[in-house]
A protein has these predicted regions:
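Beta-propeller domains
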Residues: 47-68, 179-180, 207, 213-247
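Short loop/turn segments that connect beta-strands within beta-propeller blades
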Residues: 56-59, 102-105, 142-146, 187-191, ...
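Structural signature of WD-repeat beta-propellers
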Residues: 47, 77, 93-94, 133-134, ...
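Extracytoplasmic beta-rich repeat domains
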Residues: 13, 18-37, 65-83, 110-125, ...
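Sequence/structural signature of beta-propeller modules
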Residues: 1-12
C-alpha cells in the first residue's frame, strides 16, 4: 500500500519460463494500463475489456477468467487496475465499477458503482478499498461488502494524462494524487484532511508540461512521502505534518 519497493535485484540472469494470452491489449482506441499482481502462487491480470484472468505462477496455466463488464458497449474503455488483499482480488474499471472477487475462484463477491470512470488501480488497507475517479473524487469502501464509508473531492481538472496513480497508505494516512496537481493526505478512518500539497507546474514550456496531472504513484517510506509531478518536480513531504522537506525542480 505504501508503494515503497526499495532496491530490488534479480538473482542471476533472467530466462522466460512461460507466456500466456491475457486478452486484448493496447490499440488505437484504448491503452492497456493495468499492471499484473502476484499473490499465493497466482498471477492476476486484466485486459482493456476488463477481463480478469488468473494463472498458475509456476507454469502459466489459466485457472479462471471473469469478464467484469456487464455491457458490450463498455469494451475497450480506458482505465482500471487490480489489487489483492486477504484472499480477495479488487478491480477498478473504466466504466466506474469497483468489483471484489474471490481470489481462488473468481466468484464475484460485491460490486459498487462510483460517480465516474476509474483510471488507476485501487489500494487496499485495513479493511478499506480506496479508489479515485477521473473527476478527482476519492472513495473509501468497506472491503467486506463495498459499503461507502466516506468520500473526498479534489479540484476538477479538464486536461489530464492517460491513466492515473493509485493512492498510497501508511500509518493510518492515505495519500491521493489528483489530476489537478493536488496531493491530499487524509485519515483512513474518516477522511479528515491532514494536509495538502500542490505540484502545479512552475514553468510551462509546452502544452504537455502545462498539465498538472500526477501520473506517478506517490511513495511513502519511513514517514516521508515522495511525489513526482508531470513537469519533473519531485518533492518530499513529512507524512505526519505535511511539511515540505525538499524539492527538486
Amino acid at each position: 500500500p505504501n508503494h515503497a519497493m526499495h532496491h530490488i535485484a534479480a538473482s542471476g540472469s533472467l530466462t522466460r519460463q512461460w507466456s500466456a494470452d491475457i486478452g486484448d491489449g493496447s490499440s488505437d482506441e484504448a491503452q492497456l494500463l493495468a499492471q499484473p499482481v502476484i499473490a499465493g502462487g497466482i498471477v492476476y491480470t486484466v485486459d482493456i475489456n476488463a477481463e480478469v484472468s488468473a494463472f498458475d505462477q509456476k507454469n502459466g496455466k489459466r485457472l479462471w477468467q471473469v469478464e467484469l463488464s456487464k455491457d458490450d458497449d463498455n469494451e475497450g474503455i480506458l482505465g482500471g487496475g487490480i489489487a489483492i488483499h486477504d484472499g480477495r482480488l479488487f478491480a477498478t474499471t473504466g466504466f466506474a465499477d469497483v468489483v471484489a472477487l474471490d481470489a481462488k475462484s473468481g466468484r464475484e463477491i460485491w460490486r459498487k458503482r462510483l460517480s465516474g470512470p476509474i483510471r488507476a488501480a485501487p489500494t487496499v488497507w485495513a479493511g478499506r478499498v480506496f479508489a479515485a475517479t477521473v473527476a478527482n473524487e476519492l472513495y473509501a469502501l468497506s472491503a467486506d461488502d463495498g459499503r461507502e464509508l466516506w468520500t473526498h473531492s479534489g479540484l476538477r481538472e479538464v486536461a489530464g494524462l492517460v491513466g492515473g496513480a493509485a493512492p498510497a497508505v501508511d500509518a493510518g494516512v492515505v495519500v491521493v494524487p489528483y489530476s489537478s496537481g493536488e496531493v491530499v493526505a487524509l485519515r483512513v478512518e474518516n477522511g479528515r484532511q491532514v494536509w495538502t500539497e500542490s505540484l502545479t507546474p512552475i514553468r510551462r514550456s509546452d502544452a504537455v508540461s502545462a498539465i498538472a496531472h500526477i501520473r506517478g504513484q506517490p511513495v511513502i517510506d519511513r514517514g516521508i512521502v515522495y511525489i513526482v509531478g508531470n513537469s519533473n518536480r519531485t518533492v518530499a513531504v513529512d507524512l505526519r505534518t505535511g511539511n515540505r522537506l525538499w524539492e527538486v525542480p
